């Protein structure tokens, strides 16, 4: 199997984590897996053998989907991609974000094997995607089967590309987040002040840190000793009582989730899935999330969510939801959230992806026999 990621694997990101997680699952299932992406391998690469990884070159930051995407551009990166495709006669090529002008699009153009493409984007209205769908119709036609990580992502594929995709959610190594034998506050004393945790890129407005900070005055009136921890890339000036940790390693992130009293996901737009919400659910920390459809779906629906949902962009609603979550603590909702999270373990999601592979390979085989 050949897996292609358009973004640098050594830069934290949801798509990158999915490629590495899927590669680990496929290797565990006995498949020979090769990975192509810009940049280098991260320290935690889910056991991927460096000999099975090829870089298309150094990544540069390009604005895309409200974020800064670390991609490799230019003729040299494209030539490296074409050489990799030619050198690895894979049974199936799986490209992620196939229309991003990086390794995925170049690999799609050079593909001779059956192709599965995963779409992660949740941009509701995108002139760039519409133009890409028209200008790159030939490349899109090379895709044998499309996967969307959520109904939201599937709608984007239908609207902009005029084709359908099967929904297969993102996967997670749930066991890495579950620590039933650990202190639920990860060593913090019983009398420690309540801790609120935000994970995400501090400089991206769609991640909603501004909404959380706007809610702080109301939260401090109700909880004067509240501690707010912000972890993730990007520098940001924070008010007193807030602590910025910057980018943290995966193991430290898991420890932070276990140590928090409430995890807050105040995102405002363009989220196709919400992997940080899933990580919090698996960790057993109470979740407060904006009412974006993917977040509500992860939490089991808006009617009786396994967490607290608030109206996106509304600081007062966020503060009220956090106060309720702090008063409830860990209990029925967090146990239900953990149970829901197990549905997204790679042991469940991985076989669904492999099932798509099997259908594509069977169709190609039937075409060859006819």
Predicted features along the sequence, with ranges:
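Membrane-proximal helix-turn-helix segments that form the acceptor-binding/catalytic region
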Residues: 123, 128-146, 159-160
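N-terminal strand-loop element at the rim of the active site
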Residues: 5-12, 20, 24-75
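Conserved acidic donor-binding segment of nucleotide-sugar-dependent glycosyltransferases
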Residues: 300-316, 323-329
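Acidic anion/phosphate-binding donor-loop and adjacent secondary structure
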Residues: 130, 155-158, 172-192
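A charged, aromatic-enriched C-terminal amphipathic alpha-helix characteristic of glycosyltransferases
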Residues: 29, 182, 331-357
């Amino acid at each position: 199997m050949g897996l292609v990621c358009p973004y640098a694997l050594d830069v934290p990101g949801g798509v990158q984590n999915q490629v590495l997680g899927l590669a680990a699952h496929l290797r565990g299932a006995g498949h020979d897996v090769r990975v192509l992406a810009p940049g280098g391998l991260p320290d935690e690469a889910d056991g991927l053998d460096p000999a099975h990884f090829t870089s298309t070159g150094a990544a540069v930051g390009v604005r895309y989907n409200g974020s800064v995407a670390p991609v490799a551009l230019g003729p040299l990166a494209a030539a490296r991609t074409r050489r990799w495709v030619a050198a690895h006669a894979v049974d199936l090529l799986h490209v992620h974000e196939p229309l991003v002008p990086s390794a995925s699009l170049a690999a799609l153009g050079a593909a001779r094997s059956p192709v599965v493409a995963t779409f992660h984007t949740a941009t509701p209205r995108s002139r760039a995607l519409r133009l890409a769908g028209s200008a790159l119709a030939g490349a899109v036609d090379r895709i044998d089967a499309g996967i969307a990580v959520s109904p939201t992502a599937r709608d984007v594929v239908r609207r902009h590309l005029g084709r359908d995709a099967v929904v297969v959610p993102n996967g997670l190594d749930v066991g890495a987040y579950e620590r039933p034998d650990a202190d639920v506050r990860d060593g913090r004393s019983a009398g420690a002040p309540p801790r609120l945790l935000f994970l995400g890129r501090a400089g991206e407005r769609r991640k909603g840190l501004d909404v959380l900070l706007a809610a702080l005055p109301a939260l401090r009136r109700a909880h004067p000793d509240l501690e707010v921890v912000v972890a993730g890339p990007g520098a940001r000036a924070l008010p007193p009582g807030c602590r910025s940790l910057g980018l943290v390693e995966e193991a430290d992130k898991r420890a932070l989730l276990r140590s928090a009293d409430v995890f807050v996901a105040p995102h405002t737009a363009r989220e196709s899935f919400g992997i940080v919400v899933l990580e919090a659910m698996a960790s057993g920390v109470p979740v407060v999330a904006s009412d974006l459809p993917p977040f509500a779906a992860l939490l089991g629906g808006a009617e009786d969510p396994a967490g607290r949902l608030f109206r996106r962009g509304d600081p007062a609603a966020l503060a009220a939801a956090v106060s309720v979550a702090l008063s409830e603590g860990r209990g029925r909702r967090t146990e239900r959230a953990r149970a829901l999270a197990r549905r997204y373990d790679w042991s469940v999601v991985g076989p669904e992806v492999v099932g798509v592979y099997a259908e594509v390979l069977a169709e190609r085989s039937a075409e060859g026999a006819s």
